């Protein structure tokens, strides 16, 4: 690549030796050449003698002598340059440096290697460091140097992001560039690093193709034989003019290589101009702007001052001055290229002045910003010094204590009224001693201070006064919640035990039930009834153990877990802590939080709970933990074993109506800014709302619908449509839309093969129909395809599929026992479907329902109408118990069922139900399927009785 390290100004006091002398002088008379001879007016001389006397560095820090300009005296060979004068070091270690001998730069040199650079073009009379990595271009440049043709054309690429040394098309570069001489070349093996000096502007005429290197020896022999002749200065100039012909090039053809290596160029001459008043004014303004930039930005001061002190000809030469002005700026590449391409000197001066003005404004902005930053730093430093002096003065006068003393006093003041265990006090004393030895600004100081802050914020031995009055606690619970008798009874039992013992102990309760039944809200009421502080945190989706047990102090930003945060916030050792959604706890790479809860919720272990951050035992035995969950299946068994499970079941319509009238409607009126006179909802409307819109187990959706009705009522009142709003069953749809539930159940009259079952989900109980039908007609007479089959659909889980297979096997055996001549289930291909296929279903409690549906299809008789059943059936017909009896009973009553069949072992669960739930239900408890068969098919029993009588 042609990488640039920036401009090296001609007159700058830079480190490179080439900057210690002018490389180009435009004189008005004769000047001495490098060899000591005199040149005529207008001749250009490139002085490339080295300050170390013609020696270049070799490997190991040595220098190799390539030429000795002073030993040649006034001979004419000095200006020729040749292979002997520009040699390449071939021995020694390290990079090889080639320093080229002084030579006269030819006025015309049409064929040049092309070097494409980025960002900053090379201006005439300026130096640039260029690196080349392209192999073909590297070989070409080496060949040119060996032939004493150290000249290149440097052109700017149009795309600054292009990092390549060469281009594939001339369209990728600007066609106006600079004719440059390779002043020094350092061969690094895979790349060349060169110092090039710009001499004049050139323009690309066409692309050339490089001939193979095989033609080179002949050219070199001609060159060597030509060098042996001693010629005059004119002959030397002729020879240099003929040198370009030594490298054979041809015009590029259409099938040439993609890379452009050689081009034919022509010199670009500027337009003639007169030194008018306008030109003088522009040059004076440029010089003034440069001096202003020097005054603002010290980076330009040394180089530009030396440049302008070298001679007044710099100021008097508008051509050089315009190039120098543009080169000093950090303008965009296309702006610098525009200056390079401009041939009108007046316009070039204007463009250079414009770029210098922009640079001047930028320098002023930089100076202003630097001054503001420096002033701010001075003020901050002054304020710091004054504060430190004030601290020392106050300390000497006894008005203020040291920071460390104040911190220690604050921490000890916190612990005065607390009963701190001895092992904790030892840790506090040790940390305070360590804090006194630490520097205030060290990171360890802040870590220790934060640790002591947490350690002294724990309410060691401090407890809130509990309410042990049963009557008051019961009134608080009844005031906030309707129903939930099991929960209220358990809380009152806890108060009674505490009253008899004279002290309280912590307990771990778990409320599980459908969403929206009040599990979370009852916990706050319990805290109010007991007089305890309340703290809630949710573990749903938690995957990090550190959320519960804290982080180690070694981590940045470490802090204790939720339990220690709870103690600090509540300021008591006996708060009520609600751990919400314990059935939805996660597991990740940071450990298993459910395992961390084992120590927290174990009454035998939480008296010495160890947080990772505090690293001292904390007593949690007096904390009342209440957990909530929707289902218990996802709670790990060890964790479930440590908790006292209390079922919070869903509500029936009567309970929902009471909750709505007592709690939901008054709360919604308050939120909407209405009173009872402006918006009226009758019990009939609420019943219709519950029946047609809110059939779920909880009351959360009912609360949303009530708020929706009252919001629309408020809108009508504010908009002036009505003064008061009366919601009736007739206009209810105007407030909440079309009814969601229009029918009570799928089948009002069940046909043969269809039986109603009862299901239990996380949302509560529901009715579930099981349908059976023939997939194909029964085989007639032929013995082929005699064995029947059963296909099951309805998105059933693995357990329910196994239950269906068991029911199918038992139904075939039971039918053969009851009616040996009926082989319907043996030979038929039956399809069993559970409707609502989009809803996943699983569980064994549909076994009795499936057997009844298969027998109903085989017998061609419908089951008893308004009959629902639940229970798991074994392979021998025994009916096994199931769960969710309350939810299933509520769902059956909601669907208008009058007869329910339950397993005999669930009698105790049914007996616990409230009378208003079981009222109007005929319940049968069965132990074997024969009992179900007699209840479900009463007509068949009657027919069999008649047959026996006959």
Swiss-Prot record:
Compartment(s) where it occurs, according to its Swiss-Prot or TrEMBL record: Mitochondrion matrix
Stretches of the chain forming a coiled coil according to its record: none
Role summary: ATP-dependent serine protease that mediates the selective degradation of misfolded, unassembled or oxidatively damaged polypeptides as well as certain short-lived regulatory proteins in the mitochondrial matrix. Endogenous substrates include mitochondrial steroidogenic acute regulatory (StAR) protein, DELE1, helicase Twinkle (TWNK) and the large ribosomal subunit protein MRPL32/bL32m. MRPL32/bL32m is protected from degradation by LONP1 when it is bound to a nucleic acid (RNA), but TWNK is not. May also have a chaperone function in the assembly of inner membrane protein complexes.
The organism of origin for this protein: Rattus norvegicus (Rat)
Catalysed reaction, written as an equation: Hydrolysis of proteins in presence of ATP
The enzyme's E.C. designation: 3.4.21.53
Region (Disordered): 67-94, 212-243
Stretch forming the transit peptide: 1-65
Basic residues composition bias: residue spans: 224-233
Subunit record text: Homohexamer. Organized in a ring with a central cavity. The ATP-binding and proteolytic domains (AP-domain) form a hexameric chamber, while the N-terminal domain is arranged as a trimer of dimers. DNA and RNA binding is stimulated by substrate and inhibited by ATP binding. Interacts with TWNK and mitochondrial DNA polymerase subunit POLG.
Enzyme class: hydrolase
GO molecular function: ADP binding; ATP binding; ATP hydrolysis activity; ATP-dependent peptidase activity; DNA polymerase binding; G-quadruplex DNA binding; identical protein binding; insulin receptor substrate binding
Similarity comment: family membership: Belongs to the peptidase S16 family.
GO biological process: cellular response to oxidative stress; chaperone-mediated protein complex assembly; mitochondrion organization; negative regulation of insulin receptor signaling pathway; oxidation-dependent protein catabolic process; protein catabolic process; protein quality control for misfolded or incompletely synthesized proteins; protein-containing complex assembly
Binding annotation for ATP: 513-520
Major site of localization recorded for this protein: mitochondrion
Pfam families xref list: AAA, Lon_C, Lon_lid, LON_substr_bdg
Domain Lon N-terminal: 112-360
UniProt xrefs under PANTHER family: LON PROTEASE, LON PROTEASE HOMOLOG, MITOCHONDRIAL
Active-site residues (renumbered): 845, 888
This protein's UniProt keywords: ATP-binding, DNA-binding, Hydrolase, Mitochondrion, Nucleotide-binding, Protease, Serine protease, Transit peptide
Protein name stated in the entry: Lon protease homolog, mitochondrial
